[in-house]
Amino acid sequence: MTVEELKKKKIAVLMGGLSAEREVSLNSGKAVLASLVRQGFQAVGIDVGRDLPQRLAEEKAEVAFIALHGRFGEDGSVQGLLELMGIPYTGSGVLASALAIDKIASKVIFASAGLTLAPYQVLRRGEEFKLANPLPVVVKPSREGSSVGVGIVRDPSRMQAALDEAFRYDSEILIEGFIDGREVQVGILDGKALGAIEIVPKGEFYDYEAKYTDGGAQHILPARLPEAVYGEVLRQGEKAHAALGCDCYSRVDFLVTETGDCFLLEVNTLPGMTDLSLLPEIAGGAGITFGELVLRILQAASLKI
């Protein structure tokens, strides 16, 4: 849609929600809403709950800018509702969203696309556990973001505690072989890589606190990689985005080893849009302001089914 068309429409910024990433989503939504209002759009914020259909109808929303993170927002649930209501929305559609948030399902797609993954095993609640990979390993819920419930296990005595923590958030969890490498994240806009940023967390890894605490991690843009490796991680980011059928934008996370191997971790279909978020920072490095980023995402709003 053109800017002129969009300025005639009522835009609902969906934020908050019911997931463990609620507070982050509120920050993303407030930043997006403020940007839209500054740019002259008729925008209103909606804190998403189970009354969302009623709220959308009350506000007479004609377009939805989704600034939700985690379950019931990033997993295809809200996208399906918007499809049913006929309200164009930003970001990826139902299927791509559902695949991306499910680390187990997405790994099957990534492997079939020839992308490099860390060795992993799946454990479901109630199953007998037998470790398939040598320590250290990374334990994580299958369907959470922002490193919620994630832990690194180096000592066998800490394994059960890590499993219990991950199972607090999901009935299925992943146990991945630990990859010693740089944390590199690729920003995608309109299906093309904008650049790659390197994350150097102050703690053991890039956990929730490091992501959302000012000074919790150092961001290096562009990532400190040899030219050939930098180009390869951008290509793999685009490939992962396309493999899931993502629409418009995403952030793709990698671990890059000293030998230049790029291990894909996940694709985030609704990356953070806060002051500390990586996609806006990567976009800024490509000469795209926050307002321009918001506008380009909004212009791509559509029904996908």
From Swiss-Prot:
Pathway: Cell wall biogenesis; peptidoglycan biosynthesis
ATP-grasp domain: residues covered: 107-299
Binding residue positions for ATP: 134-185
Binding annotation for Mg(2+) 1: 253, 266
Keywords on record: ATP-binding, Cell shape, Cell wall biogenesis/degradation, Cytoplasm, Ligase, Magnesium, Manganese, Metal-binding, Nucleotide-binding, Peptidoglycan synthesis
Residues that hold Mg(2+) 2 according to the record: 266, 268
Cofactor binding note: Binds 2 magnesium or manganese ions per subunit.
Keyword Cell wall biogenesis/degradation: yes
Free-text function comment from the UniProt entry: Cell wall formation.
Full protein name: D-alanine--D-alanine ligase
Organism: Geobacter sp. (strain M21)
Organism ancestry: Bacteria, Pseudomonadati, Thermodesulfobacteriota, Desulfuromonadia, Geobacterales
Protein encoded by which gene: ddl
